[in-house]
């Protein structure tokens, strides 16, 4: 997997001060995407163990609230297979930090609850979802763009609290 950039002090992609990883590779190709260069799976630099360690080190300070994944598309199967073991390391090394993930896929598609879904599902999808606290789901829709929304770009996108959703068996929206 490649990545395009790491932001070590981000306040736009989740609550508090965050470390943000922009992965490369996306098949959604949303009109108006703010990172179209990340559609290419080969764009950027190789995500390797040294990058993992750099991110873990960046997450250590107390003022960092958590990690955010976006891109590109973190839930493209080839990206999941790299991100899942990394997220396990994040949970082990930084158990008090939260993890947010932006995806153009809907929660129902990722969980397999939508009939005919499965394009993004692979052998690690469920386990990867279990490591994420908040999923911002849905493609960016230019016609629904709203710059006043908190932590999302278009009206159709949802901030889903995955922990509470799992507990209650239905989608529970995040509310800080």
Enumerate the language-model features and the residues they cover.
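Conserved Radical SAM active-site core
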Residues: 1-3, 17, 35-115
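Short, flexible, glycine/charge-rich loop motifs used to bind or transfer phosphoryl groups or to couple energy/partner
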Residues: 10, 57-58, 90, 123-126, ...
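A generic structural signal for alpha->beta connector loops
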Residues: 96, 131-132, 156
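Structural recognition of alpha->loop->beta junctions
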Residues: 53, 60, 114-144
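P-loop/Walker A phosphate-binding loop and immediately adjacent motor/lid segment at beta-alpha junctions
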Residues: 88-91, 100, 145-176
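N-terminal pre-triad scaffold of radical SAM enzymes
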Residues: 2-29
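Flexible, glycine-rich phosphate/dinucleotide-binding loops
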Residues: 12, 108, 168
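Conserved strand-turn element in the central/C-terminal portion of the radical SAM core barrel
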Residues: 74, 106-109, 135, 171-176
């Amino acid at each position: 997997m490649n990545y395009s950039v790491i932001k070590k002090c981000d306040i736009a992609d989740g609550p508090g001060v965050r470390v943000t990883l922009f992965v490369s590779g996306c098949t959604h190709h949303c009109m108006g995407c703010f990172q179209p260069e990340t559609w290419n799976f080969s764009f950027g630099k190789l995500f390797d163990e040294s990058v993992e360690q750099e991110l873990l080190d960046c997450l250590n300070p107390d003022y960092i609230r958590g990690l955010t994944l976006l891109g590109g598309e973190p839930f493209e199967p080839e990206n999941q297979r790299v991100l899942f073991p990394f997220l396990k390391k994040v949970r082990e090394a930084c158990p008090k930090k939260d993890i947010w993930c932006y995806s153009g896929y809907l929660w129902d598609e990722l969980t397999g609850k939508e009939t005919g879904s499965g394009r993004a599902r692979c052998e690690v999808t469920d386990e990867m979802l279990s490591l994420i606290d908040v999923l911002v789901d849905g493609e960016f829709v230019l016609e629904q763009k709203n710059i006043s929304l908190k932590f999302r770009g278009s009206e159709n996108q949802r901030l889903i609290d995955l922990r509470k959703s799992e507990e209650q068996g239905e989608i529970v929206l995040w509310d800080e």
